[in-house]
Amino acid sequence: MPTGKFSGRFPAWSVVQVDCLDGDTFVKFVDGTGRLTGQVDYREKLDARVWCHVGMAEAYRLVALDASRVTDVSMDVPGANGGSTKELERQIDLLARDVSPFVKGHRYYSPVTYFWPDYYNGATSKWNRTLGYGSSLGVVIMNRNSGDWETFDADFQKQAARALSAGAKRCVFYVKTQYGVAELPKEDPARTGVPDVDKYTQDYILQQIAWAKKNYPNECQGVFLDEVVNGWGAQAPRLDWYRQLFKKIRDLYGKQFLIVVNTGSNIADDFVSADFDICMCFEEKAETYLKNDAAKPVMTDRMMQEPATRWWHVIHDVTKDNYQKVVNQAASLDVAHLYITDGQLVKGEDGQWKPEVNPYQNPPSEWVMPLTIAWVNGYLDIFNRVIALEAKQK
């Protein structure tokens, strides 16, 4: 077999084939981060024999192998035994359904990264501080002006690529949905007080996703749909609108394209079965999280029946005194994605639309990082004992 290692970035969920002069062939599967996984022979699994060759110049840029033995490199399988591209893509998609970077029983630090790319700021970079969490990272969010992706921005491309290289499992691009009110009847009370009330139609949302995927094909691995209904009470009729939106996204980008929704609260039982991958279902103060009011629980019984990897809790106003209680609560609620910050939320006269103090304008303080990494990786108790021991010795 050829010697050497693959290097460079590849389109997420693509297939890479390397043909060698001596007849050896490498067939590799690229995961959602653009990294190569173990050897997978799709010729056996899918009987795929028609490949799209990218040419030698591209081959040398993408792979680092003994060049004398490489004859060609292929990426993305466009056909199988003369069959249609669509059919082969369907088969690959079926296989990809079970390939997820989020493993049952594991925990992930999934930060709310609404701040602008600033990788060039060195030690003062908010992103650099965030990416210091390394392999503990789960989902990261790219947010350009609340989801304006029409034009390419090199800073966003570089920042997203750096996040994936640092250890983030998936990079999703922010698009606001504003609770689906844009397509409600004009007289519907849910539209009252909503800025740009007619803006966020399904067509507008899908166009923003399309631009994000076009401009950042390797980095845009999913969408973060903000301001999504929870399905309770008067919001229940809008669930069908969201189901339609999810289906359109799936039809366009496949199962491997991550759909993350932010409801900010627990969701109605009817919404749990909807085709999203992750729901940010808590976004409140630590005090509220710890109280877990039975009248408005953090997680409903129906939600608790689902895999932990579907849920994402965001807790702000966390302190050194209540941090341990907060992570204990997260463990008891069996949530896989967690963002804990000592940032504060202070709502202004315009409520949630324009808060006076935004808990996401900066990363958490430095004391949060070692505790969170320890919790994610399952050794927080040992970490706390070591810290206590060191304190006694001083």
Residue ranges and their predicted role:
Residues T3, S7, T37, T71-S74:
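Short Trp-Ser/Thr-centered turn/loop motifs at beta-strand boundaries
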Residues A12-Q17, H53-D66:
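Noncatalytic modules at the cell exterior or secretory-pathway interfaces
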Residues G23-G38:
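Short, surface-exposed beta-strand/strand-loop-strand elements in extracellular ectodomains
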Residues S68-A80:
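Exposed low-complexity, polar/acidic, P/S/T/G-rich flexible segments that act as propeptides
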